[in-house]
């Protein structure tokens, strides 16, 4: 009797195995659809169809796996010995048919309000949202991503079974013991593969991509000739050692003549000193060069000395630097130190301790030299940090009193990552009744937090006047850098329970696992938001400086004059 080509025994074993990867468990499909629908709910920032498809696929795959686990456990614990299980073939057919019909229909229908939700979030950011027809493409991406993840997991399960069968044949082990050992072996191999190959390979590729960029020079930027700048012919830090961001920092900004026109009185040439990765072999050597640069440029005779730990790439926000220089009419010195050329999020994953060690070393080196000066001949000592630079700066202080003890006049930390040690400690110990998004600590005497709504927001939540050192955190309610944490996987944070901030959707909630991946996706889009939203603080930084480090006699009108110059840089140069 001939064998039909459609019968399973006529197929090649590899084809049978490959086809088995596509066969789905119906309980898993139901949970996968549920988690996909939950992933469509709004988060901190707008998501286009591609990002939503990625997040939807990841969450659908997790939901599928959870559903399979629940279904299998329920069968083994409750149903295997039940008299009424399994139901009749007819009932089982209609149960499966219902899942097949309802799951995809629910996913498609949920995309319609999801597009509307994204338009609402986009409106909060001041940008245009997606169209509903265009957003339907989300389902295609999610299906592909989900299928790949589920298939990958099934391959791992098959690998465990293969190892278990080998152990049973070779050592005659009990099934459960063989499965346990097989799982341990596959997990160990998987961890080795991920940590030893994939992760290291990712960082190696990131380094290979970023290093040439760091060796380049920004378009339109040339070596400074003024001795007040690192990289100049008179500098101890050669131009070609400063890195991409360092060269941009020392070669840009307003000069004395432009500041004089802006402020209507003679200005000083701002001092900008910087050390790149190639300026010296290590951080201590680079710090020594910077202290030498500060002495060479007579930076300690200026009105303000600003220490600015950089972000991962070595970037110092030009708004932070220029606004302070405008406020003090050039009577300033700014010092920065590069510790990496990788983007901040990669530096954070690769070695966040490196940024903290570098920041601590920079602050200690400059502070030690500053402290040697007679008290009445010291400049105002000011600290600034944005994003990973904020985390680097906080590493220099075990607790808040250390900031005052070291003699800092003002500290401005912008968009601190959630793992920042001092920020987290202050949030945990905030005054009773204040929220995580708008916290208050010690009635705002030394440290304050602002959403950067307007210039007056810094004082709005304070219950007492400033006392001594002024420390200010700027944190947008929509900034995922501030709010992302692994804790989002299984814990609802206070900021998602309390009243929302000004630019966070009222529709955002918390769902286990789902919210974690949503906010993770928001991280990739955080800096592309308009100023005042996400991780783009723009001219909000000026309001921060006006709050913590205003020159004598500074007024709200002066702040607006500088703001106009920041918004129209050409006006000061004309």
Model-derived features with residue positions:
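Short glycine-enriched nucleophile-adjacent loop
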Residues: 390-402
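Short, Lys/Arg-rich, polar N-terminal cytosolic tail immediately upstream
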Residues: 1-20
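C-terminal His-loop and adjacent cap/lid subdomain of alpha/beta-hydrolase
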Residues: 14-379, 399-574
């Amino acid at each position: 009797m001939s064998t039909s080509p459609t019968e399973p025994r006529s197929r090649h074993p590899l084809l049978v195995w490959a086809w088995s990867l596509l066969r789905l468990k119906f309980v898993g499909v139901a949970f996968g659809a549920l988690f996909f629908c939950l992933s469509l709910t709004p988060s901190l920032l707008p998501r286009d169809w591609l990002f939503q498809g990625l997040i939807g696929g990841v969450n659908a795959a997790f939901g599928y796996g959870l559903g399979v686990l629940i279904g299998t456990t329920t069968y083994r614990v409750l149903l295997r010995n039940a008299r009424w299980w399994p139901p009749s073939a007819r009932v089982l057919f209609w149960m499966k048919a219902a899942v097949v019909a309802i799951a995809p229909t629910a996913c498609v229908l949920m995309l319609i309000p999801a597009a509307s939700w994204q338009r609402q979030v986009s409106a909060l950011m001041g940008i245009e949202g997606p169209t509903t027809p265009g957003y339907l493409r989300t389902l295609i991406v999610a299906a592909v991503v989900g299928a790949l993840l589920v298939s990958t997991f099934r391959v791992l399960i098959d690998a465990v079974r293969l190892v278990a069968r080998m152990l049973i044949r070779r050592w005659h082990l009990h099934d459960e013991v063989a499965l346990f050992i097989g799982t341990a072996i596959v997990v160990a191999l998987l961890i080795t593969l991920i940590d030893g190959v994939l992760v290291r390979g990712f960082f190696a590729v990131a380094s290979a991509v970023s290093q040439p960029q760091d060796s380049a020079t920004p378009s339109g930027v040339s070596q400074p000739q003024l001795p007040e700048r690192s990289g100049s012919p008179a500098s101890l830090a050669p131009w070609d050692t400063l890195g991409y961001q360092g060269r941009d920092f020392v070669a840009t900004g307003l000069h004395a003549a432009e500041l004089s026109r802006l402020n209507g009185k003679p200005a000083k040439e701002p001092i900008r000193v910087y050390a790149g990765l190639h300026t010296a072999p290590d951080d201590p050597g680079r710090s020594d060069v910077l202290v030498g640069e500060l002495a060479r440029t007579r930076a300690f005779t200026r009105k303000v000395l600003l220490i600015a730990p950089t972000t991962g790439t070595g970037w110092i926000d030009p708004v932070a630097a220029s606004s302070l220089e405008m406020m003090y009419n050039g009577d300033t010195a700014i010092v920065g130190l590069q510790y990496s050329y990788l983007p901040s999020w990669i530096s954070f994953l690769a070695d966040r301790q490196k940024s903290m060690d570098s920041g601590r070393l920079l602050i200690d080196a400059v502070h030690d030299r500053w402290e040697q000066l007679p008290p009445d001949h010291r400049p105002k000592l000011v600290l600034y940090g944005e994003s990973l630079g904020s985390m680097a700066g906080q590493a220099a202080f075990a607790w808040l009193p250390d900031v005052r003890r070291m003699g800092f006049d003002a500290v401005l930390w912008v968009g601190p990552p959630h793992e920042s040690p001092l920020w987290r400690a202050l949030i945990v110990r905030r005054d009773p009744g204040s929220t995580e998004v708008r916290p208050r600590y010690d009635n705002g005497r030394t440290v304050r937090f602002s959403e950067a709504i307007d210039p007056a927001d810094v004082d709005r939540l304070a219950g007492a006047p400033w006392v001594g050192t002024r420390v200010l955190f700027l944190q947008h309610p929509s900034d995922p850098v501030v709010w992302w944490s692994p804790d989002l996987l299984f814990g609802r944070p206070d900021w998602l329970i309390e009243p929302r901030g000004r630019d966070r959707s009222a529709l955002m909630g918390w769902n286990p696992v789902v919210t974690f991946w949503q906010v993770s996706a928001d991280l990739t889009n955080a800096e592309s938001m308009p100023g005042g939203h996400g991780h783009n603080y723009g001219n909000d930084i000026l309001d921060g400086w006006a709050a913590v480090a205003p020159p004598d006699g500074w007024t709200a009108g002066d702040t607006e004059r500088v703001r106009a110059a920041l918004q129209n840089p050409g006006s000061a140069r004309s």
